[in-house]
Amino acid sequence: ASSVADARAMIAAMPPGKTLAINWPLRWVKSHVTAKRLVDEGLIGEVIEIHSYGGNRGPLYHLADKIEVSREEVERQKPTSWWYKRASGGGSLLDYLGYGATLGTWYRNGEAPLEVTCVTDETPGIEVDQHAIVVCRYATGLSKMETRWGTFTDPWMIQPQPKCGFVLVGTEGTIASWDYADNVTVQTRAKPEPHPIPADPLPPRGRNAIEYVLGCIARNEPLTGPLDPATSLTGQRIVDTAAESARQKRTLPLMP
């Protein structure tokens, strides 16, 4: 959705007996699914911090057929490109914060933050942000969600530094789950040295949104996780509050 109001309207429009699903492609990344399993199994205790970093080199690098564009040409196009227009909903925050906010809500079993603070870059001649840092205050402490148009490399090709993905901090350990990785890296009280755990293969009928939704319908089960409208609504509330926080340059309570 483009706003909390639109998200609530979508939920209200869902006919009785029908299913509304919101697809997040990162939900089908096996490392992130494995991280959720380990959290649910209690490996790291209660999740008390989430750090996410999401982005890419920038939208103008990704033309049809993945035609490569030079950095000089990208910079030349930025001031006039619709990607970089506020009225078009441009910017790294609106592009990527939904992933960190929604999957972060999933990892926290639906818990919402109390307050949100967001700071964005302000590049002369560019209407929208290319870098946003969002701090969410939860009852258990702070979490950080960062978005970037301008990573050194695209994470689906070569993971940049900082790496794109999630670090989950729990009362009994930590999990680092990077986008598109074949394993997660774990610390626990029993084994504090960071060590890899192989990512689980995605199960049959759970490899993508269509398989998952059809399976839930066939089993008469509700959707869970990021595809659940309630989880995505919390993510949207974080996004909208962050955008308004950046505009007002102050901390705000989470939007209802």
Set out the residue ranges of the language-model regions.
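A short helix->loop->beta-strand "cap" motif at the edges of active sites that frequently abuts
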Residues: 16-18, 141-142
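ADP-ribose/adenylate-binding Rossmann-like module
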Residues: 1-3
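Predominantly a Rossmann-like dinucleotide-binding segment in NAD(P)-dependent oxidoreductases
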Residues: 18-21, 26-124, 249
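A short glycine-threonine-serine/GTX helix/turn-capping micro-motif
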Residues: 87-94, 195-204
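Alpha-helical structural signal in soluble globular domains
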Residues: 6-16, 38-41, 137
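Contiguous beta-strand/loop segments that form the cofactor/metal-binding neighborhood of enzyme cores
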Residues: 69, 95-183, 200, 207-222, ...
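C-terminal helix-rich "cap/oligomerization" subdomain common to oxidoreductases
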Residues: 6-12, 19, 127, 212-256
